[in-house]
Each structure stands twice: as C-alpha cells, then as structure tokens.
C-alpha cells in the first residue's frame, strides 16, 4: 500500500544561471536573469498535501522595469528550480525547472520619413561584405496595388563607394510587379516578396545574406529566399540612405533600424524584432529612431555611425507608438 503524505520542495535561488543557459541554448535566445530586486515571491516553499497532486500557487509579483533596464536592450527572464526538502525523494526532472520570459511591449516615438526628408548615414568606414543583415520596423501609409502603381518607393538603399560594385536596395514596387510587393536587389539580381503588403500596418522586415543565399523575413517568418553568386558586396561610408526624393510618395514611419556584418539566423531575427542588446556580436549600426524630436538619429551600437535627414529637415514625430502593431 502506497503511503499518503505531504511532499515539500524549496524554490531554489542557486544554480539559476545554468537553468536559463539551458533554455537559451534550446531556443536560440539570449535572456538574462531579471535582478532579484525586480520581483517578489509569496513563498519559497511548495507543498503537495497528502491526497492531492498540486501545491498551493506561489504568486510572483514583477515590478515595473527601471528606465535603465528598459534602455539596456537586454531581455530578461525569471528562472526557478525546485529541490526536494526530503532527501529520500527527488523532484521529477521534467518539472523541476520553470522559466518565465519577460518581453517588453515597446512604445516609442517614431519619425515620419518622406521625399522631403530622406535619411542619410555617415558610416565609420567602407565595407566589403560577404555576409550581412538589414532589419527594421516599418509602417508606410501609401502603397500601389496595381502592377507598376507607385513603384520604386525606396525604403533602404546602400551602394558601393566610387569605383566599386555593391548594392542593397529595398523598395516597394517595380515596373513589372505590384506597388505593394516588396523587392530587394543585391549582387546584380533581385528577389520579390511572396506577400502583398497593406498600407498603415506595422511590419518587421529582415533581409539576410550568407554570401550564397538571400533570405527575406516578414515578422520573423521566412517569406522568400534565393541562391546568390557569392559576390563581395561593397558599401560606401556615405552611400546608405532611407527613402528617395522622386518616387517615394508615401510617409514612412521607422523604428529599430539595424545593420549587421553577419548573417542572422531565422530564430535570432524572430526573437529580437523589437529589442536587442546594442553590444550584440556583429551589430555594426543600430538606430533606435526613438529620439522624439530633431533631425538626427543616434547609433546605439557605440560605433559612431551618424544618421540625419537631408538638409536637416525635421521630420514629423509621432509619440508613444506601439511598434509591434498590436
């Protein structure tokens, strides 16, 4: 006959780094432990009483993140580990650890870019790239729907320095495709999106080149891919911009513009669409575009890549925008 008795476990505060490290490795994430000062627990002991299969709930209260933590770009989690108080009885391994991930809902000011105030970058150097990633959040208020309608609305352009070949050119529409179909040009070829986009809608867009493969992600999901020749992509220090002055008829809101000198994986893209650690490996330039005023945009990576509107024309700023569109 099985004995009916109470079983007690402690919610441990030790060895939590390894718990979170295992979670990060399994999910291609980079969460850090939330500082203990940022949350409280109603109890550190869980007891399953005789004749029952669950303990009383333990309440975790999470305090609002400090401004410093919000601006750090880091993502936080609470890791918990159960350890039996009875030396003769263990805790089932499959249920002994719990990880609560905390993803910020990002509200920020965003600039409105159009044909009158393109953004031009002054980078710290020229680039010779085999791998790269460009990503940003975008909301465009005017898109054509017919073939050739409102074509060539540039949303990102980068070209080689004088005398060198190179291009990363991203636009909505082209003469033979619909105005609400996305297109990227690089290495002398081009790729169109499978998706047709809606105006006045927030999207996270990411374009990843491994050298011989090009990927397009929309909201972290693969939309299209193609093989490439593996050419070097040269980019000039003063040859990167947002928008164009002739074909761009829309107002375009931007946030979280990032330029990487490495190919990001699908999981890395999907898990970091709205927040990223500015010191991430390979993050060459990072414009949050959340200043809320003015005509210049700070490079949060610390690499000193400057960005400002042409002619110092101050864009319209929209305050307190939820950039995931939800």
Residue ranges and their predicted role:
Residues 136, 198-209, 214-216:
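Short tryptophan-centered beta-strand motifs in secreted/extracellular beta-sheet-rich domains
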Residues 1-11:
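Single conserved hydrophobic/aromatic residue that forms the stacking wall/gate
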Residues 226-253, 278-282:
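Flexible glycan-contacting loops in extracellular carbohydrate-active proteins
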Residues 96-112, 274-326:
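Extracytoplasmic low-complexity segments
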Residues 66-77:
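Short glycine/proline/serine/threonine-rich loop/turn segments at secondary-structure transition edges
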Residues 183-204:
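Short, aromatic/His-centered strand-loop micro-motif at the edge of beta-sheets
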Residues 106-179:
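Extracellular glycan-recognition modules
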Residues 131-142, 248-272, 284-294:
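Extracellular, beta-strand-rich glycan-interacting domains
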